[in-house]
A protein has these predicted regions:
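Short, small/acidic-rich helices and loops at N termini and domain boundaries
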Residues: 1-2, 35-64
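Feature primarily recognizes SF3-like P-loop helicase cores of small DNA viruses
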Residues: 1-32, 58-439
Length: 439
């Protein structure tokens, strides 16, 4: 044992508080929202911290050393606690410094950050040819800027864009290779997850705290029973109520972006609101050529270009910021969203059908009569009818689009005043006999 005795160990007594003061005087460390943060970002694994504390203590503290290390870590949480540690959105912390949105770069790690990417900034990095060729083979040219902007969007802890992305294909195109490359770019700041789990498990959101990106590599095809958790993540622009199993809920920063690869659409079982679909950027892949021979090493080749991919994504981020966080969206992508929306809500097709109803400014029809006609249209077209309440809600939500007006002052066949819509005329009417119709 050396002759030097630290201030936190005097006369055989170990002072945990003084130890933490000594430790924090030589280490940049803070504790907030249930996690330690350093100049390297969030401390994902506390074991290196415990090991360093152990090495400092082992020469002076003998019995129950492991337990005392645990106690020190707990005291360190109190000593390093800060009231708030909000995300900073005008810069990207990288392995060799900080890249600001205006393009300036500062070397070194002078400050504690929430997230630091494991990639070096090299303004002279070569163009990522494998990556660009892969995207060119996978996606339509007009959709590549959207991917560029979305990946760039994920570099900063901000949800201002209020969009998630779904890349949809038939299978075998290689779209999931994007996730492998992003894992190299984001490191521990990205998580593999499940959109379905997020939608149905109230604890799943807390698992995405401090995370920049969540990738669902193979999104489930089942429609989501509830969408509020997913929508809240996509649009969060501040602290959110988070809950971990067996613990009291708390307010935490949420800025994780959602990216899903799928062979189908992201649908909702009950939510047919425009907001659910408006938050999705839906891209479709090209058909895989029958003659194409897949390169089994393509993911590794692209990952080796990660410094060039960073520059490419940063260019997309700068364009997105310049456009006020409005994503570049091709007509194909817009059409994809409209098709998904219509597929989940056949009320649109009913309103645009012929022979059942007619849009007419001076006409009016009761909600009940419209729903009965809608059910007949569904039956004759082998479609599933939504419930009456959902049907009325869909009409109300889109009444401006079809020049309708919701009212509770329509006279039915019995002369009673009921709910209905002005601007639509029934061309068929239900008879009193069930399942019987007359024109």
């Amino acid at each position: 044992m050396s002759n030097f005795t630290p201030a936190w160990f005097k006369k055989g007594f170990f002072n945990e508080s003084l130890f933490c003061d000594d430790f924090l005087s030589t280490h940049q460390l803070l504790y907030s929202n249930g996690a330690f943060f350093t100049p390297d970002g969030r401390m994902v694994d506390p074991m290196p911290l415990r090991c360093e504390i152990f090495e400092m203590m082992r020469e002076y503290v003998g019995a129950n050393l492991a337990k005392k290390v645990t106690n020190v870590v707990d005291v360190l949480k109190l000593a390093a606690q800060v009231e708030d540690f909000p995300p900073v959105t005008d810069r990207i912390a990288l392995a060799n410094g900080t890249l600001y949105l205006d393009g300036t770069f500062q070397e070194g790690k002078p400050e504690i950050v929430r997230n630091r990417l494991p990639v070096k900034y090299d303004p002279k990095a070569t163009q990522p040819t494998h990556w660009l060729r892969f995207l060119s083979d996978l996606l339509y040219p007009e959709d590549i800027p959207t991917v560029q902007e979305f990946i760039g969007y994920c570099l900063i802890p901000s949800n201002k864009g209020q969009r998630m992305m779904v890349i949809k294909g038939s299978g075998g195109e290689g779209k999931s290779q994007i996730g492998v490359v992003l894992s190299r770019l984001f490191g521990c700041n990205m998580k593999d997850g499940s959109i379905g789990k997020i939608s149905e498990n109230r604890f799943a959101r807390a698992d995405l705290e401090h995370t920049l990106l969540c990738v669902d590599d193979d999104m489930r095809m089942e429609a989501l029973r509830q969408t509020n958790y997913v929508k809240s993540i996509v649009t969060a622009q501040g602290q959110m109520d988070l809950e971990r199993k067996g613990k009291q809920s708390y307010q935490g920063w949420m800025y994780a972006r959602l990216l899903a690869f799928s062979n189908g659409d992201l649908q909702a079982l009950y939510d047919r609101s425009d907001g659910f679909y408006r938050r999705q950027l839906i891209l479709t892949t090209k058909d895989k050529p029958l003659s194409r021979v897949d390169d089994p090493d393509i993911a590794e080749k692209m990952a080796a270009e990660v410094e060039g991919i960073l520059l490419w994504a940063f260019e997309g981020l700068q364009r997105l910021v310049k456009n006020g966080f409005q994503f570049t969206e091709s007509e194909r992508a817009k059409c994809n969203r409209e098709l998904v929306k219509r597929d989940n809500n056949n009320v649109f097709d009913f309103l645009e059908s012929e022979g059942y109803i007619r849009l007419k400014a001076d006409a009016c029809t009761s909600s009940k009569e419209l729903y009965e006609i809608y059910k007949m249209w569904c039956e004759e077209n082998s479609l599933n009818a939504i419930k009456a309440r959902g049907f009325s809600d869909a009409l109300i939500a889109n009444q401006r689009r079809y020049n309708l007006e919701s009212t509770n002052n329509i006279a039915n066949s019995s002369g009673r005043r009921v709910r209905g819509f002005v601007g639509i005329e029934a061309l068929v009417q239900p008879d009193l006999t069930p399942n019987s119709w007359r024109v």
